């Protein structure tokens, strides 16, 4: 019987093996702030590289940008964030704990096995539901709540030497707006024709009321977003194209179908400007959570920026001889969230013999933080084994380990997800060959050192 996969086990491994540390740890930390350690930064970078490879580099349609975090405040007025980017905040009067009202209801429903979606409900409807169902504070058990009020999620700061309303700016709550305001620049300089997309990876900031579940929801996070511009009327076929593309990208990196589901938003959930929205959800140990939002945003964003900036962001289509404001399909993915999902997907405990259980992270080789570990059987072989390490390290992120028994070293590498271990033994001095052990099957093959480059050439592609 397989051991239960829990967040407690995954978080413990992440902290102990250098994937993720509590932020500001020696000062007692900061609520829900996390630092990526040596293995975590490699894993997350590999996730970002995999996204960039398929969505930008190999795509015939898309190009990339890297926009500033700090933008003219009018950008956020135009986008609607200043006026409407808020969460419903509710306080428990007895213990003074603050909650996000919709999440309070969702958690209550999950605990009581109630199937009911709160997306799209107004504050008055949320409040009425809390009263009707007798929803209680998870901190103290009280049902004595304040009224719901709006809480703007943007971090505000000041630019320059004065702290007044004229110098107010915001940390961006999403990367998308940097793409929209650069639509004309990118189209002009790249001479792209519709349909085409602009993607970027970057940090965003949201002053979440109830962050939690490790790195799933944090106030500082990284996004991988694509804005794909197309002709009006063809948006729904492109929406389906990108929805399928995103889903297949996850499958190609070893996510199991049974741990993924596509949830189409009901009409009452949709934003007023949206033709369609689908969430790709992943089954975390704590339950289903949104990974990817794919939205047909129509021409809303470009038109908003046209109105507020007075700049013309329309496009003249040389094929149809028409001028129009393009529609936009937005697949928006959280880099931290999907990295956590890959970590949860990869975690496994396998009984290799009676009473002998190994912990192994079954990452797709393209995502594995360490690709190859070089393990000399004896420290006396270190000088020759190091030459193998140096040769491979030019192409792959490798680890060299000569401490402990070979069995313990294999287990250490299994636990951090290293796909291949190379053992350099005393025979290697004579036959110029090494033993390669596969992480998942634990099977071993003997390979000439001079053939290693060819052996690994296609092992890390997807």
Swiss-Prot record:
Reported EC number(s) for this entry are: 6.1.1.14
InterPro entries found in the cross-reference section: aa-tRNA-synt_IIb, aa-tRNA-synth_II, aa-tRNA-synth_II/BPL/LPL, Anticodon-bd, Anticodon-bd_dom_sf, Gly-tRNA_synthase/POLG2, Gly_tRNA_ligase_bac, GlyRS-like_core
Question: What molecular functions are annotated in GO for this chain?
Answer: ATP binding; catalytic activity, acting on a protein; glycine-tRNA ligase activity; protein dimerization activity; transferase activity
Question: Which positions bind substrate?
Answer: 100, 174, 221-225, 330-334
One GO BP on record is: glycyl-tRNA aminoacylation
Q: Where in the cell is it found?
A: Cytoplasm
Question: What main location does UniProt list?
Answer: cytoplasm
Catalytic activity of the protein:
tRNA(Gly) + glycine + ATP = glycyl-tRNA(Gly) + AMP + diphosphate
Q: Where is the signal peptide?
A: none
Q: Per the similarity annotation, which family is this?
A: Belongs to the class-II aminoacyl-tRNA synthetase family.
Indicate the quaternary assembly.
Homodimer.
Q: What does this protein do?
A: Catalyzes the attachment of glycine to tRNA(Gly).
What is the designated name of this protein? Glycine--tRNA ligase
């Amino acid at each position: 019987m397989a051991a239960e996969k829990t967040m407690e086990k995954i978080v413990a491994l992440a902290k102990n093996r250098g994937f993720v540390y509590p932020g500001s740890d020696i000062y007692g930390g900061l609520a829900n702030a996390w630092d990526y350690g040596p293995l975590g930064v490699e894993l997350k970078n590999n996730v970002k590289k995999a996204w960039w490879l398929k969505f930008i580099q190999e795509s015939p349609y898309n190009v990339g940008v890297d926009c500033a975090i700090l933008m003219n405040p009018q950008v956020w007025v135009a986008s609607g964030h200043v006026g409407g980017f808020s969460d419903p905040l509710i306080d428990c009067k007895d213990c003074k704990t603050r909650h996000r009202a919709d999440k309070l209801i969702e958690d209550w429903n999950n605990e009581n096995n109630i199937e009911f979606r709160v997306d799209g409900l107004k504050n008055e409807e949320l409040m009425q539901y809390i009263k009707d169902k007798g929803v209680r504070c998870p901190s103290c058990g009280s049902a004595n709540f304040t009224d719901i009020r709006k809480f703007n999620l943007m971090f505000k700061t000041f630019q320059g030497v004065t702290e007044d309303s004229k110098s107010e700016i915001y940390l961006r709550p999403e990367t998308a707006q940097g793409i929209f305001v650069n639509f004309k620049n990118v189209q002009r300089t790249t001479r792209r024709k519709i349909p085409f997309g602009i993607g970027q990876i970057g940090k965003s900031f949201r002053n979440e009321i109830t962050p939690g579940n490790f790195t799933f929801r944090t106030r500082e996070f990284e996004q991988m977003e694509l804005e794909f511009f197309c002709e009006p009327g063809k948006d729904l076929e492109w929406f389906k194209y990108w929805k399928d593309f995103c889903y297949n990208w996850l499958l190609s990196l070893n996510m199991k179908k049974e741990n993924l589901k596509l949830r189409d938003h009901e009409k009452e959930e949709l934003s007023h400007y949206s033709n369609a929205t689908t969430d790709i959800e992943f089954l975390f140990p704590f339950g289903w959570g949104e990974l990817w939002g794919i939205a047909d945003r129509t021409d809303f964003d470009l038109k908003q920026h046209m109105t507020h900036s007075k700049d013309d962001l329309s496009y003249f289509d040389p094929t149809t001889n028409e001028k129009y404001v393009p529609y936009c399909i937005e697949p928006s993915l959280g880099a931290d969230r999907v990295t956590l999902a890959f970590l949860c997907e990869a975690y496994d405990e396998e009984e290799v013999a009676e009473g002998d259980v190994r912990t192994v992270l079954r990452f797709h080789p393209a995502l594995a933080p360490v690709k190859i570990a070089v393990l000399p059987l004896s420290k006396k072989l270190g000088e020759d084994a190091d030459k193998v390490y140096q040769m491979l390290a030019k192409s792959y992120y490798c680890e060299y380990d000569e401490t402990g028994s070979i069995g313990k070293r294999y287990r250490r590498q299994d636990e951090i997800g290293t796909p291949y271990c190379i053992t350099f033994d005393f025979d290697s001095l004579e036959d110029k060959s090494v033993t390669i052990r596969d992480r998942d099957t634990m099977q071993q093959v003997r390979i000439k050192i001079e053939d290693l480059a060819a052996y690994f050439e296609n092992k890390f592609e997807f």
